[in-house]
A protein has these predicted regions:
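A conserved beta-strand element that flanks and buttresses the S-adenosyl-L-methionine
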Residues: 116
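Class I SAM-dependent methyltransferase SAM/SAH-binding core
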Residues: 51-53, 57-105
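Conserved class I S-adenosyl-L-methionine
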Residues: 2-44, 59, 63
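Core SAM-dependent methyltransferase catalytic element
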Residues: 209-211, 217, 221-240
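A short glycine-rich, Lys/Arg-flanked "PGG" loop and its adjoining helix->strand segment in the class I
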Residues: 130-142
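Short catalytic micro-motifs in class I SAM-dependent methyltransferases
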Residues: 119-120
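C-terminal alpha-helical "lid/dimerization" subdomain adjacent to the S-adenosyl-L-methionine
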Residues: 149-208, 217
């Protein structure tokens, strides 16, 4: 993976990135689903070790650490500015470690109860996606949990239609030229966005020894696309 992208916002400040993402119903909906599923599958954990893949500014780990006892939080990203913000985010964990690395090259011990992967898998080229899953697997304890947020799309035309539909559902007062450019570049990206079908992802995870425990389809909730297209948050358990 490379931070160099054909999507301009990834080359700008983190504030620009976060502000644009907050206007997306799929993004904000995924965060709500993430917390809802965490409340079910982490509620009985006394103290957890968390690894956050492609963590960005650490928001998802912070959301977990504010609600559950976290013994260690390991945050991995290839963007140094994002990691610096994560370091200063006052994450409520006994120990916080940040790792500046390509996620495919990181070597983690199988000591984590939870791996967070929110919109990270589709930034990995298709030929490397199995390796990404292997890195997740190697980081987890047996029976560990993967919280996976993903946008599933089987082909480029569906991806373009998804982002057009998304833009149509953003209120006019939030639909700035910057947001429109961001979504258009994301839809058309061929060097930072590698979306795949839900069937493709589920096959890889199942073959790696994961079992799907739960899921929430976040967006869209209408019938524009078939059931397997859109933004999902899923709970996977490592069983083998």
């Amino acid at each position: 993976m490379s931070i160099m992208s054909d999507i301009d916002v990834y080359k700008k400040s983190t504030g620009d990135y976060e502000a644009l993402q907050e206007r997306r119903p799929d993004y904000t909906g995924a965060r709500n689903a993430f917390l809802k599923l965490a409340s079910v599958y982490l509620k009985d954990k006394q103290s957890i070790s968390v690894a956050d893949f492609c963590c960005g500014t650490g928001n998802n780990t912070k959301l977990i650490a504010d609600r559950y006892s976290v013994s260690k939080a390991t945050l991995i990203d290839i963007n140094e500015e994002f990691l610096q913000i994560a370091k200063n985010a006052d994450i409520n964990a006994t120990h916080v470690e940040t790792i500046y690395s390509d996620i495919l090259k990181v070597d983690l011990k199988p000591e984590h109860d939870l791996v967070i992967s929110m919109f990270a898998y589709h930034h990995v080229a298709d030929g490397d996606k199995k390796k990404f899953i292997d890195v997740v697997k190697n980081a987890l304890k047996n029976n560990g949990i993967l919280l996976l947020g993903e946008i599933y799309s089987p082909d480029r035309s569906t991806t373009l239609a998804y982002y057009n539909h998304l833009l149509d559902h953003i209120p006019l007062d939030l639909k700035t030229p910057e947001l429109q450019k961001f979504l258009q570049q994301t839809a058309e990206s061929d060097d930072f966005e590698y979306k795949v079908s839900r069937v493709f992802a589920h096959k890889q995870l199942t073959q790696a020894g994961f079992k799907l425990l739960d899921e929430i389809k976040v967006w869209p909730i209408d019938q524009t696309f078939n059931r397997d297209v859109g933004t999902f948050v899923e709970v996977w358990k490592l069983i083998g």
